[in-house]
């Protein structure tokens, strides 16, 4: 039997009982002769004045709902005992607030790079310096540096040598004794051309530099070490087909400037230069129509930190490094051909 059915039956019984209690109660009063007189006494009426008749209290009829039990039904299924796996963790009830996620530990600030102090020169034999292999160009300036790399022809004097290696060790050069080309006919490790580039007045300038162990047109003449360089001025390295606008080549303390570069000194995108001397003057460069040799190129930003520090600090005597931080822009300004 459902709970609702029991509830309504109980209400009906209770209403019936109250109705009977509210009706006229019949009471029997014994007369003085022993006969019985049946009187109707209305509940709630004035009591009899002749004889005090005690009205019996109505019998209270009720149902104790505490003894009722509910039968399971489809709408209220019976409780079932559910067995949980032994590794199940029950959350406390009421549920506790989850602790906040801890903030990640901030990365420690790296210690500042200590000052390496002044550069200490590291000289090695001129024929012991290993060149940098030409790296694959990545940036626009690096690609332009390879595209416009010049070629050099050696008429007299030394072949170009690498000046510095990855550790910052620099070639010690040669004395001016002996023949102009004595002991400097070429490095067994290969040679090097150094590049550096920049914008100047809306034109892209690329400087290419070569190092020679000595500059000696004749025995006992000249000096240890020599640097020579050429500068190619192009319109814009970012366009698909950049063009050479002008060129300048180092000549003693100045430049030979060509605006525009003669077509006969350009091989595709390569400027042709010659290393020569006019006795008794020292060696210098000039543009030429003759082809020359290429060397592995390395741009300034592709050098190691030690190599750049060495080139910024080492004194090559009467020869100065044209593309280091102190000389590069002044040289570009002096070579301006427009």
Curated annotation (Swiss-Prot):
Protein name, as recorded? NLP effector protein 6
- List the top taxonomic levels of the source: Eukaryota, Sar, Stramenopiles, Oomycota, Peronosporales
Region listing for Disordered, in residue ranges = 68-119
Q: What is its main location?
A: secreted
Attached carbohydrates are found at 81
Q: What induces it?
A: Expression reached the highest levels at 3 days after inoculation of pepper leaves, followed by a gradual decline.
* First and last residue of the signal peptide: 1-19
Which function does this protein serve?
Secreted effector that contributes strongly to virulence during infection by P.capsici. Causes large necrotic areas in both host C.annuum and non-host N.benthamiana.
Conserved undecapeptide motif I, short sequence motif: residues: 205-215
Instruction: Give GO cellular component annotations, separated by semicolons.
Output: extracellular region
Location relative to the cell: Secreted
Q: Which residues form a coiled coil?
A: none
Domain description = Key residues/motif important for the effector activities are degenerated in most NLPs, including the nlp24 peptide consisting of the conserved region I (11-aa immunogenic part) and conserved region II (the heptapeptide GHRHDWE motif) that is important for phytotoxic activity.
| PANTHER family in the cross-refs | DOMAIN PROTEIN, PUTATIVE (AFU_ORTHOLOGUE AFUA_5G00600)-RELATED (PTHR33657:SF8)
Compositional bias segments (type: Pro residues):
101-117
Question: What protein family does this chain belong to?
Answer: Belongs to the Necrosis inducing protein (NPP1) family.
Annotated motif Hepta-peptide GHRHDWE motif II: location in the chain? 222-227
Keywords attached to this Swiss-Prot or TrEMBL record, sorted alphabetically, are: Glycoprotein, Secreted, Signal, Virulence
């Amino acid at each position: 039997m459902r709970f609702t059915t029991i509830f309504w039956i109980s209400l009906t019984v209770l209403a019936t009982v109250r109705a009977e209690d509210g009706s006229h109660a019949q009471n029997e009063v014994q007369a003085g002769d022993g006969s019985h007189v049946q009187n109707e006494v209305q509940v709630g009426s004035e009591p009899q004045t002749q004889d005090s008749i005690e009205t019996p209290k109505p019998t209270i009829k009720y149902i104790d709902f505490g003894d009722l039990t509910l039968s399971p039904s489809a709408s209220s299924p019976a409780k079932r005992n559910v067995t949980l796996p032994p590794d199940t963790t029950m959350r406390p009830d009421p549920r506790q607030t989850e602790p906040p996620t801890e903030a990640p530990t901030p990365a420690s600030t790296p210690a500042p790079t200590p000052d390496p102090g002044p550069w200490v020169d590291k000289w090695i034999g001129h024929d012991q310096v290993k060149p940098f292999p030409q790296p694959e160009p990545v940036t626009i300036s690096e690609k332009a540096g390879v595209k416009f790399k010049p070629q050099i022809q050696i008429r007299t004097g030394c072949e170009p040598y690498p000046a510095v290696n990855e550790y910052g060790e620099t070639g010690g050069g040669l004395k001016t004794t002996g023949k102009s080309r004595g002991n400097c006919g070429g490095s067994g490790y290969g040679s090097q051309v150094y590049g550096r580039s920049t914008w100047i007045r809306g034109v892209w300038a690329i400087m290419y530099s070569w190092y020679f162990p000595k500059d000696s047109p004749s025995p006992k003449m000249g000096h240890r070490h020599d640097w020579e360089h050429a500068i190619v001025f192009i319109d814009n390295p970012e366009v698909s087909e950049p063009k050479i606008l002008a060129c300048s080549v180092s000549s003693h303390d100045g430049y030979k400037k060509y605006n525009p570069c003669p077509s006969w000194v350009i091989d595709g995108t390569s400027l042709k230069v010659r290393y020569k001397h006019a006795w008794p003057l020292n060696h210098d460069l000039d543009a030429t129509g003759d082809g020359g040799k290429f060397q592995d190129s390395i741009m300034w930003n592709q050098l190691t930190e030690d190599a750049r520090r060495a080139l910024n600090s080492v004194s090559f005597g009467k020869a100065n490094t044209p593309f280091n931080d102190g000389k590069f822009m002044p040289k570009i300004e002096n070579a301006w051909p427009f």
